[in-house]
A protein has these predicted regions:
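Extended, charged alpha/beta regions that create polyanion-binding interfaces
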Residues: 47-154
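Substrate-gating cap/lid alpha-helix
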Residues: 262-299, 325
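Serine-esterase "nucleophile elbow" of acetyl-processing enzymes
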Residues: 5-6, 60, 103, 120-203, ...
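Short, amphipathic alpha-helical "lid/cap" segments that border enzyme active or binding sites
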Residues: 235, 320-331
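A short helix->loop->beta-strand "cap" motif at the edges of active sites that frequently abuts
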Residues: 249-253
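Oxyanion-hole/transition-state-stabilizing segment in secreted/luminal serine hydrolases
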Residues: 186, 203-248, 259-266
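Glycan-recognition and processing domains
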Residues: 7-50
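Single conserved hydrophobic/aromatic residue that forms the stacking wall/gate
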Residues: 343-354
Length: 354
């Protein structure tokens, strides 16, 4: 059921600034990738192109309250993710240069949603960033404000961008809300736009993805590329995948991250055998490729969610705690590589990771 909200004026969010898209699609403002240009045979991948994981709307308003009403394509809720992550949104406001969470847009049980995000503000202009649903196709989005308030596009604060290609870990499972995925958090922490190109369960070093990434302009590329493919797939596809990207981006950092240890393998012997073979296969091949190509880097280490299972929601996908651990372990190493490319990185303040 669609619940009426109390805001007196609504603005079509597609008329505001939209960031986080790899290849925008005409007529579908919230798609991450244009599916008419990149035609994937896999229907799930095509659907995921339309999921706005990591996409955000930027605007400035002096309204005392901010609301939203939006529609999503029909889809069942996943059991290991929050409704807010899947169909909801979260709003950040920039104060004194720091992005601070202001509220969340609560989704309904059906496909039409309306929610008050924040109210009783002081009426002074606020710079806002609204993260969109990570696990649903967003069909329409309107932002509600007071009748006499202004809503204007806000210029992107990011001057550099890094494409992050990966699995469900990159897509966002199972952060508590869209703004808590690790690419979104690292963007706020560094002042660099980490663009989310996560494809849950379907990041398997396919040639189609190599073509998409080869034709995408960015300052650097970060890969969570080993969580989905089998050891056999890695052996068969990795060399060609890397060669395609090196040829297309010979001067851009190509940073590959080791996959995480799946803690189900702590007790499940079959799982342990499979995951250990995959980790060892990726490790051996990436060390060779990092020596072969000057712009290829490998971040080893599979324990970034922690050696316990407390950093996951299901022994596989990260929780907010797990992603906090991951960022603490990975980001200093990523910063070092990006600085070698003379990319300016902001130093985080105490509140930025929130």
């Amino acid at each position: 059921m669609f619940h009426a909200a109390s805001a007196q004026k609504y603005v079509d969010a597609s008329t505001l600034t939209i960031i986080g898209r790899t290849c925008p699609m005409e007529g579908h403002p919230y798609y991450r990738v244009d599916t008419t240009r990149y035609r994937f045979d896999n229907a799930t991948i095509r659907h995921y192109c339309g999921y706005p994981a990591g996409v955000a709307v930027l605007f400035t308003t002096d309204s005392r309250r901010i609301e939203a009403r939006w529609t999503t394509a029909p889809r069942s809720y996943g059991w290991n993710m929050t409704p807010v992550l899947q169909r909801g949104m979260d709003l950040y406001v920039r104060e004194n240069g720091v992005w601070t969470m202001a509220g969340a847009a609560r989704p309904g049980l059906q496909d039409r949603h309306a929610s008050t995000i924040v109210e009783h503000m002081d009426g002074q202009p606020k710079e806002c960033m609204l993260y969109l649903p990570a696990w649903s196709e967003l069909l329409t989005l309107e932002i509600g404000v007071d009748e006499g308030a202004s809503v204007t596009p806000l210029e992107s604060p990011y001057k550099h961008r890094v494409i992050v290609f990966g699995s469900s870990v990159t897509h966002g499972a199972s952060a508590s809300r869209p703004g808590m995925t690790y690419p979104a958090r690292m963007s706020r922490m560094t002042g660099i736009e980490f663009v989310n190109l996560g494809y849950s369960g379907n990041c398997m070093l396919q040639p189609e993805f190599a073509r998409l990434l080869a034709e995408t302009d960015a300052d650097a590329f970060l890969f969570d590329a080993f969580s989905n493919p089998s050891p056999k797939m890695i052996r068969e596809r990795l060399d060609a995948f890397v060669a395609t990207l090196v040829k297309a981006h010979p001067d851009k950092p190509l940073i590959f991250m080791q996959t995480h240890w799946h803690t189900a393998g702590n007790l499940d012997q079959e799982a342990a055998k499979f995951h250990r073979e995959r980790i060892n296969t990726a490790d051996g091949m990436m060390r060779r490729l990092a020596k072969q190509y000057d712009n290829v880097y490998f971040l080893d280490g599979e324990w970034f969610f922690g050696r316990d299972a407390e950093g996951t929601i299901d022994c596989d996908h990260g929780s907010d705690l797990g992603y906090d651990r991951m960022i603490s372990e990975r980001l200093p190493r990523i910063r070092k590589i990006l600085r070698l490319s003379l990319i300016h990185i902001s130093e985080p303040t105490r509140r930025t990771p929130i």
